[in-house]
Curated annotation (Swiss-Prot):
Converts internalized glutamate to GABA and increases the internal pH. Involved in glutamate-dependent acid resistance. GO terms for molecular function: aromatic-L-amino-acid decarboxylase activity; glutamate decarboxylase activity; pyridoxal phosphate binding. Active up to 70 degrees Celsius at pH 4.1. This is Glutamate decarboxylase. Coiled coil: none annotated. Belongs to the group II decarboxylase family. Pfam families: Pyridoxal_deC. Optimum pH is 4.7. Active at acidic pHs but inactive in the neutral pH range. PANTHER family: GLUTAMATE DECARBOXYLASE. InterPro entries: Glutamate_decarboxylase (IPR010107), PyrdxlP-dep_de-COase (IPR002129), PyrdxlP-dep_Trfase (IPR015424), PyrdxlP-dep_Trfase_major (IPR015421). It comes from Lactococcus lactis subsp. lactis (strain IL1403). CDD domains: DOPA_deC_like.
Length: 466
């Protein structure tokens, strides 16, 4: 969010710290205070400002990790001050990043015959930007070599309308036409019957999504790869796939290792993921890998002289703390393959349980039951004849602390209002039982309430987060 003068409150107030007049201070809001205050007082003031915020553990809107072990937190707190970009000053941190890239490449079945490359980012949004830039630059080289007039029209990117907002940003920032393949009731992921209709010689690439933000569904990347392969056989203007696996990239390899969506597929040339989602690290850390260095244009790799050393870097951001990299490596060391598998399978069971319990109420149609990503989505049945809607239900659940988003589906399905539960590693079966009980009580209260009917349905977004 961007902030400006209109975001300011009208007044500032004197705040006593637990009734002590001697520690009564002016809480600064929009201008620095003239004088310093004691650290204990500053701590209490800032802590009090956050008293009425939601409990992150009860936030079922976010994909982001909301719990890490104390040992991980300790390691991360010990490395907060380290700038991960200072490769020469912190060589062990650099090696840890390299190990993480190699471990992820192995999970994604990178071939020993190819020379994969990858880097950390501060999240999947940056990783998507880098993957998109590589596709654009590579397309431009191929197009110029084939004699295509690259200035005749905008290059384009093909993606499902269930895309994450970072792709819209990418297309705006780098002047790319976004070609959205519409979702519909029969196609809640990329429509394989229509996707190739959007591809032409100006297409820089096709994005497949492993975990659509709205519903948690996977695009069928293997089927998409087959379509791209057939297309490439018929033209000199080759097209390749970038997989946005922000959510699924560190989930699917453990829960569905036989599912082919990664570098096992010939035309998948790059993949991104979020370490702070199902990689189980606090925000924010992301990863992007290319199957071979030939898919990463040299002009996007910078060699920077910095504090006595020369380093190759490919990032939009520069300075960032090493702590999230350390947290990711801790998790890889701590859990190993079997540990991640056990955690994610448990999360999967919780999601499936919730879907069944919600369906038992008889009022909801399950849009996604958590059988892929542990995301449960549902809408009110069309014949429910209730005086309340999902926004009302979200309000009632919030009274118990549960933050549950209600929102319309993307273009072409915007009249479908759904709720989404993102089940994370720290959401166990006991919490699931509590949620079901609170949901049942909320429904009972709404059924008994004298509700002022909504004159017009408002397809707003309530508590939705990517």
């Amino acid at each position: 969010m961007l902030y400006g003068k209109e975001n300011r409150d009208e007044a500032e107030f004197l705040e006593p710290i637990f009734g002590s007049e001697s520690e009564q201070v002016d809480l600064p809001k929009y201008k620095l205070a003239q004088q310093s205050i004691e650290p204990r007082v500053a701590y209490q003031l800032v802590q009090d400002e956050m008293l009425d915020e939601g409990n992150a553990r009860l936030n079922l809107a976010t994909f982001c990790q909301t719990y890490m072990e104390p040992e991980a937190v300790k390691l991360m707190s010990q490395t907060l001050e380290k700038n991960a970009i200072d490769k020469s000053e912190y060589p062990r941190t650099t090696e840890i990043e390299n190990r993480c890239v190699n471990m992820i490449a192995d999970l994604w079945n990178a071939s020993e015959k190819e020379k994969f490359m990858g880097t950390s980012t501060i999240g999947s949004s940056e990783a998507c930007m880098l993957g998109g830039m590589a596709m654009k630059f590579s397309w431009r080289k191929r197009a110029e070599k084939l004699g295509l007039d690259i200035n005749a029209k905008k290059p384009n990117l093909v993606i499902s309308s269930g895309y994450q907002v970072c792709w819209e940003k990418f297309c705006i920032y780098w002047d790319i036409e976004m070609r959205e393949v519409p979702m519909d009731k029969e196609h809640m992921s990329i429509n394989l019957d229509k996707v190739m209709d959007y591809v032409d010689e100006y297409t820089i690439g096709v994005v497949g999504i492993m975990g659509i933000t709205y519903t948690g569904r996977y695009d069928d990347i293997k089927a998409l790869d087959n379509l791209i392969e057939e297309y490439n056989k018929q033209t000199d203007y080759k097209v390749y796939i970038h997989v946005d696996a922000a959510s699924g990239g560190l989930y699917a390899p453990f829960v569905e290792p036989e599912l082919e969506w990664d570098f096992r597929l010939k035309n998948v040339i790059s993949i991104n993921t979020s370490g702070h989602k199902y990689g189980l690290v606090y925000p924010g850390v992301g990863w992007v890998l290319w199957r071979d260095k030939k898919y990463l244009p040299e002009e996007l790799i910078f060699k920077v002289s910095y504090l006595g050393g020369e380093l190759p870097t490919m990032a939009i951001n520069f300075s960032h703390s090493a702590s999230q990299l350390i947290g990711q490596y801790y998790n890889f060391v701590r859990y190993g393959f079997d540990g991640y598998k056990a955690i994610h399978e448990r999360t999967h069971k919780v999601a499936m349980f919730l879907a069944k319990e919600i369906e038992k109420t008889g009022m909801f149609e399950i849009m996604n039951d958590g059988s892929q990503l542990p995301i449960v989505c549902y809408k009110l049945k069309e014949d429910s004849n209730r005086g309340w809607n999902l926004y009302d239900l979200a309000d009632r659940l919030l009274m118990k602390g549960w933050q549950v988003p209600a929102y319309p589906l993307p273009k072409n399905l915007e009249n479908e209002i759904i709720q989404r539960l993102v089940i994370r590693a720290d959401f166990g079966m006991n919490m699931a039982f509590n949620y079901v009980q609170d949901m049942q009580e909320a429904i009972e209260a709404l059924n008994k309430a004298h509700i002022l009917y909504h004159e017009e349905p408002e397809n707003k977004t309530y508590g939705f987060t990517h």
